[in-house]
């Protein structure tokens, strides 16, 4: 399969031989149907449309299952074809290379359901549910515990994997259990202790297991108006301190305690520094924004430049929070 790219990551679809995974000279992609499901696999799917940075090349193969059975069928298809599997949630904490991703990309954004249990105060959600939407839903019911998460740009599955957090709270604080799917199609329910949580990370990162659903412990019974008001304040604070006028992935670097990554970058004089269409945000230095026409390589090289400059001045190695997918060798 081939990817034709111009400025702004324009992907040209080439056809896929559904039996041998070989390209043809046609520009019309054949459709791959997963047996016993209503799921189809796309070839050469442009990933820029599925990432918050709005950059990146194409996936060799892309599938977005809508239920557990289709997800298991997708993994079986990958195993039988000896395909590498990459999981994609909301694409809000990712940088996909301009060359795209080989193998099969499985998007979990269509895995959707949520259940608020008033007897236990527990919220069970599918991996593809939006974290901000869940925060608003909980607030409107008078359930406390997710107010801080209203500005987290991602899905429940991604939040569980990276231990998403804000305002001194995080997913690990309220997670009861997570259901994960192994490459062989078996399901397992894991506790927070088994997930090995620490700051913005878990044992699921870098692994091949996929989160299918999670159960969170919340606190029902509060006045909905008060919970909504607190949630609105968190959202207002987020909007006033972080850039939302341009595409970004959220925070780029983990905070190297006791310092703030944004403060270190700002004190190094890098606010507003730009490579191509990628810029260190003026509002918050731990954000890199796509000012328009940025390539993944622009963002990657800006990340490396920031790391180098901060290391030179402060002798501190900034560790990226953003996950990089694809090949970046020789990008800078």
Curated annotation (Swiss-Prot):
Its cofactor is FAD. Signal peptide: none annotated. One of its GO terms (cellular component) is cytosol. It comes from Nostoc punctiforme (strain ATCC 29133 / PCC 73102). The gene is murB. It is an enzyme of class 1 (oxidoreductase). It comes from the Bacteria. Its main location: cytoplasm. This is UDP-N-acetylenolpyruvoylglucosamine reductase. Its EC number is 1.3.1.98. It is found in: Cytoplasm. Cell wall formation. InterPro entries: FAD-bd_PCMH (IPR016166), FAD-bd_PCMH-like_sf (IPR036318), FAD-bd_PCMH_sub1 (IPR016167), FAD-bd_PCMH_sub2 (IPR016169), MurB (IPR003170), MurB_C (IPR011601), MurB_C_sf (IPR036635), Oxid_FAD_bind_N (IPR006094). GO terms for biological process: cell division; cell wall organization; peptidoglycan biosynthetic process; regulation of cell shape. Keywords: Cell cycle, Cell division, Cell shape, Cell wall biogenesis/degradation, Cytoplasm, FAD, Flavoprotein, NADP, Oxidoreductase, Peptidoglycan synthesis. One of its GO terms (molecular function) is UDP-N-acetylmuramate dehydrogenase activity. The active site is at residues 200, 251, 321.
